[in-house]
Amino acid sequence: MASLKSIIRQGKQTRSDLKQLRKSGKVPAVVYGYGTKNVSVKVDEVEFIKVIREVGRNGVIELGVGSKTIKVMVADYQFDPLKNQITHIDFLAINMSEERTVEVPVQLVGEAVGAKEGGVVEQPLFNLEVTATPDNIPEAIEVDITELNINDSLTVADVKVTGDFKIENDSAESVVTVVAPTEEPTEEEIEAMEGEQQTEEPEVVGESKEDEEKTEE
C-alpha cells in the first residue's frame, strides 16, 4: 500500500484557475465514498503516477486529506493525450472489508508451442471481471499459454485462481487461442491468377453488327 499527499482546494475554481493548477504540475481531484464527505483536492501529477506504477490501477492508496489519512482507490481519471497530461482524478474512499467488482488485466505468460510452429496467438479477452476485498484484488491475472498447440484455446474456466478473489465472467468465454497461419499464395499461383485476368476480354458495350447494318439501310 502506497501513500500520497493531497491539498484541499478551497472555494469554487474557474477554468482559468484549473488551467494554472495543471500548468504547475498539480491535478485537480475529488474524494468521495465510504466514511467521508465529498472533498475537492489537488495532488502532484508525478507523485500520483509513481504511486499507480507501484500499486497498480486497482491498488489501495493511503491518501492524506488535511489531518486525515483515507484509504482510497482510483475510481476514474481523465487523460489529455494531446498534452500528455492527467486532467482529473476521482478517488473513492473504501471499506477494506467490503468486496468490490473491478476489471483486472490478463497477462499472457510463456510462448505457445503452436506459435513456434507458425501459429498466431489471438487474445479476444484482455480484462476479467473480478470480485474481492480491496486488499485481495490482483494487479493482473497470469495465463500460461506455453502448452497451447495450433487450434488450442483457453477459456475463463481454464484460468487458475491463485488468490482470494472470484472471476465473474462466463466460464465458457474465450481468453486466448492459437490459430493456424493464413497460407499465402505461391509465386506460381500469383502468376496463374494474373494470367487469367489478362486473358479475360472486357465486354464491349455498344451496337451489334446487325444493328449497324440496319442503320445503314
UniProtKB/Swiss-Prot annotation:
Q: What cystine linkages occur within this chain?
A: none
| Keyword Amino-acid biosynthesis annotated | no
Locations of Basic and acidic residues compositional bias?
Answer: 206-217
| The keyword Ribosomal protein belongs to this UniProt entry's keyword annotation | yes
What are the recorded GO MF terms, alphabetically?
A: 5S rRNA binding; structural constituent of ribosome
**What CDD domains does the record point to?**
Ribosomal_L25_TL5_CTC (cd00495)
Q: Where is this region: Disordered?
A: 178-217
GO BP annotations of the record are: translation
InterPro entries registered for this protein in UniProt: Rbsml_bL25/Gln-tRNA_synth_N (IPR020056), Ribosomal_bL25/Gln-tRNA_synth (IPR011035), Ribosomal_bL25_b-dom (IPR020057), Ribosomal_bL25_C (IPR037121), Ribosomal_bL25_long (IPR001021), Ribosomal_L25_dom (IPR029751), Ribosomal_uL5_bac-type (IPR020930)
Q: Where is the composition biased (Acidic residues)?
A: 184-205
**GO terms for cellular component:** cytosolic large ribosomal subunit
Could you list this entry's UniProt keywords, alphabetically sorted: Ribonucleoprotein, Ribosomal protein, RNA-binding, rRNA-binding
In terms of NCBIfam families, this protein maps to: bL25_bact_ctc, PRK05618.2-4, PRK05618.2-5
What this chain does, per the entry, is described as: This is one of the proteins that binds to the 5S RNA in the ribosome where it forms part of the central protuberance.
Member of which family? Belongs to the bacterial ribosomal protein bL25 family. CTC subfamily.
Under the subunit heading, UniProt states: Part of the 50S ribosomal subunit; part of the 5S rRNA/L5/L18/L25 subcomplex. Contacts the 5S rRNA. Binds to the 5S rRNA independently of L5 and L18.
Protein name stated in the entry = Large ribosomal subunit protein bL25
According to its UniProt entry, this protein's organism is Staphylococcus aureus (strain USA300)
In the record, what lineage is assigned to the organism producing the protein? Bacteria, Bacillati, Bacillota, Bacilli, Bacillales
